[in-house]
């Protein structure tokens, strides 16, 4: 990123006429403005105000015209963000925020609804402008987020506006908090019996469809930090010692819990 900025500066100095040269402060301001387009401050404010116990108060947000305008302005900046200039944890956080933000936007556009399946093509057909490209929610998750980072914890962070997903965070993801928040969401996942439970005497594990071969088993197995044989062993770092030992043994039958597509609406 620093190299790219430096090259751009050289081009400006070498190719511009003397009276067209911009002062250093102007160039720095332009770079700062471009970075701000990718920043999630406005989305963070919205989440803190409208997320209640992991659910979104869509009805209240829909009625708040000023906040809706601010939200749309944030989404417009996301659409114009030059994602080639962000990387690492900032890149990770950007795509989680984009996914969650456009989920909320999709629900607001279709409000009132009770189930996201009421929106035709919500995940795989409807496109949103992100980083000057038109992408579906599935594109954001499976092309921009999971492959480059190979971190399956993303499945605990992206929330497709339903109760099957881990409750949405009440703050935006940033380069500074993404690691800690991902681990927090993983711990929330294993503590919810709707997502995960074990019957040690009965040698049985019940876990969300997220871990099934039909869904995202391959993402957990491909995670660069994972060393187990069964996808469910991915949860070992987030459970108590007895459960961790049981999962690591591999001596159990895995059953997958049906996904709850009901809207994650507060109230």
Regions found by a protein language model. Give the residues of each.
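Interaction/scaffold regions that mediate signaling and macromolecular assembly across diverse proteins
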Residues: 18-267
